[in-house]
């Protein structure tokens, strides 16, 4: 059973965001924006086999409240209406969509019928504090430590699939993140994340600019199981952008084993005058 007020809020939100997205004037302590998109998909394993057709109507709502110059509160909603063949094949699909990996379960299937279901997820819910060179963010947030465009072994807090093309914001984590900026081109970060299985990820990162490249080093503890160390870079190589990352994982339970797992990726990309883009990226895992 669901609350009528929640459904009313979602319906009202769909109407507002479908008509237009807007932000309040700068003098207002509140801001709101969003969008409405739809994606049709076809699933098949051969041209002669059966084809499954699905549609997702995706609405996003972003709210921010600027309490003071140094304090911001944010809540962002991802509302999706699923229709089609996958929605008609039982509860497994809707249960997978409803799954929330965070400490708090902030995903709900508001309506479930035989041929469609409506899910809403709060993927950002945080308080942000900043003062001079220091910034702290507490709550569900995106911690993006990746440098490459396809695979991101440095992104130990928010792993995601490159093929999840309808989710440009990427998933968030229930975390505490501290940042200190020694200079305009460098940052020291410390982040701690928990999840629903009580696994802990904690890591530190140092990023700086040298020789025209953004270079970073990180070390930490991943998913209550692995010691982690890594590095990443992004910069220019002639007319191309050159990016890469490497991360080493070593299980604590097998500490005497000196091999561990190394994931290395590197790639080049280029944006042309007509705004088209070409990219190549390779990955190695031992």
Residue ranges with predicted function:
Residues 21-33, 87-93, 226:
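Outer-membrane beta-barrel biogenesis signature
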């Amino acid at each position: 059973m669901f609350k009528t007020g929640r459904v009313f809020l979602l319906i009202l939100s769909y109407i507002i965001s479908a008509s237009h997205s807007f932000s309040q004037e700068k003098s207002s302590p509140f801001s709101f924006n969003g969008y409405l998109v739809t994606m049709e998909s076809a699933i098949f394993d051969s041209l002669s086999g059966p084809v499954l057709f699905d549609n997702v109507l995706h609405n996003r709502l972003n709210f921010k409240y600027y309490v003071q110059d140094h304090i911001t509160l944010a809540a962002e909603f991802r509302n999706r209406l699923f229709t089609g063949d996958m929605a008609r094949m039982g509860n497994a699909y809707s249960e997978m969509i409803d799954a929330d990996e965070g400490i708090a379960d902030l995903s709900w299937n508001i309506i479930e019928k035989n041929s469609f279901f409506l899910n809403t997820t709060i993927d950002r819910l945080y308080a942000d504090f900043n003062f001079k060179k220091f910034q702290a963010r507490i709550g569900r947030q995106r911690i993006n430590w990746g440098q490459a465009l396809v695979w991101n072994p440095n992104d130990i807090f928010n792993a995601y699939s490159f093929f999840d093309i309808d989710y440009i914001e990427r998933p968030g984590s229930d975390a505490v993140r501290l940042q200190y900026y020694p200079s305009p081109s460098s940052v020291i970060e410390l982040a701690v994340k928990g999840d629903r299985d009580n696994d802990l990820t904690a890591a530190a990162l140092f990023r700086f600019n040298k020789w025209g490249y953004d270079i970073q080093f990180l070390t930490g503890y991943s998913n209550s199981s692995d010691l982690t160390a890594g590095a990443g870079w992004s910069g220019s190589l002639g007319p191309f952008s050159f990016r890469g990352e490497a991360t080493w994982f070593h299980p604590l339970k097998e500490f005497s084993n000196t091999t561990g797992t190394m994931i290395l990726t590197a790639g080049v990309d280029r944006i042309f005058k007509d705004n088209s883009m070409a990219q190549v990226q390779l990955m190695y895992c031992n």
